[in-house]
Amino acid sequence: DDVFLTKKLNADGCHLGQKDMNISDARKIIGNRIIGITCHNSIKLARVALLKKADYLAFGAFNLSETKKVKYKASINTLKKAKKITNKPIVVIGGINSNNYQKLLLNKANFLAISGYVWNNKKLKPVEAIKKLKWK
């Protein structure tokens, strides 16, 4: 969310939410580094992000999440529609775990945002949680 920190750390890129800095201003600061945009459950927001040259799109929440309060509910249909309008990578977020990730991958999600599953998992240590995400 922090373009200035991205530049200071010489990071590969950053992710911008709808209430963060706009992508045009971010590009002026970090140039051609990766910028991803939150699109919630909206193909309209995705189209705007693509016009502004986002490098990837993020949709969610696909499930209930303990990491953030769910304000927008995305669906497999949202993911399918997004894949029809772009070849850019799609990140899926929101309550993703070892019981529900495969359906998202089968529907062509490129990346899984799984911080809550990894770091807040009450049953598994982080490495164990990640290992459980094997393609079955």
Segments predicted by a language model, with ranges:
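Generic detector of intrinsically disordered, low-complexity, polar/charged segments
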Residues: 10, 14, 33, 91-92, ...
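Glycine/Thr-rich beta-alpha phosphate-binding loop at enzyme active sites
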Residues: 7-16, 37-86, 121-129
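Acidic side chains
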Residues: 1-2, 12, 20, 55, ...
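Alpha-helix-loop-beta-strand connector modules within alpha/beta enzyme cores
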Residues: 1, 20-42, 70-98, 130-136
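Generic structural signal for hydrophobic
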Residues: 6, 26, 49, 82, ...
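Short hydrophobic/charged patches on amphipathic alpha-helices used for structural packing
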Residues: 3, 46, 101-102
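Glycine-rich phosphate-binding active-site loops on the catalytic face of alpha/beta enzymes
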Residues: 18-25, 58-70, 101-135
